[in-house]
Structure formats: C-alpha cells, structure tokens
C-alpha cells in the first residue's frame, strides 16, 4: 500500500491535534497541583467500567505502567490525600483504590476544564481523525 503526500499530512495533522490536547491536559493538571500521571490515575479510577475493580493491576493496565510504578503513583496520591486503599471484601489479599472527597473534587475541576477545552478544540480533532479514516477506507476499497 502506498501513501500519498496528503495521507502523511492527514496523519501529521491528527497527531498534532492529539498532542495539542495532551499538552493542554498536562498543563491543566499542573495548574491544579497534580502531575499528569496523577490526573490520569484519578480519572482511570473514577472512570472504570461498571463491575471493574479499582486494583493496582487494573490501573497498571489502563495507564500502560508497570505494577511497581503504579504502587509508587498510588503511594504519592494517598500521601496527598487524593485516594484511599481498602482491603477487598471477597479477596482479603486484594487492595482496592478509591478517590477521597478531596481527590473527587480535584478530578471534577479538571474534568470540567477538559470538557470545556474539548467543546472548543474537539471539532478540529474530529475533523483530523475523519480525514485519516476516509483516506484509509478509500485505500482499502481500491
């Protein structure tokens, strides 16, 4: 499969739009006195699908981090009062992670800011993604 110059431009624009949002997210986290990974962890905990337990292993999976890195991350979050750990009811060896009221409030503030940014910048991101998808479909149909 060959790619035209426009294909590279479309991919580059999509990558730029993604990176622009990620940059906003990183800066916004820092303005709220969190490191970007801490913000991502709070969001991952709060946003887990129903029925998914908030374990270190699940967080490692969702954050693309190693187990020991998530342990260190949760240690820092717990020390700052953003999360609490609780022993599992069914499996006493299992440690579950929950947001504290302080963590939930910080995440809520950040999430509002992210939604506002996406309301403004989201259409550009969607357009860039749609350009890549359309080109991919055209090349697969040919």
Model-predicted segments: where are they?
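Charged, amphipathic alpha-helical coiled-coil/dimerization segments
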Residues: 75-133
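Short, structured helix-loop boundary elements
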Residues: 8-11, 35, 56, 115, ...
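N-terminal leader segment of winged-helix/HTH proteins
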Residues: 1-32, 80-82, 142
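Pre-recognition alpha-helix immediately N-terminal to the DNA-recognition helix
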Residues: 13, 20, 40-44, 105
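N-terminal helix-turn-helix DNA-binding core of bacterial DNA-binding proteins
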Residues: 23-66
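Short, charged, intrinsically disordered terminal tails
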Residues: 134-142
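Short, hydrophobic-biased segments on the C-terminal half of alpha helices
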Residues: 56, 74-75
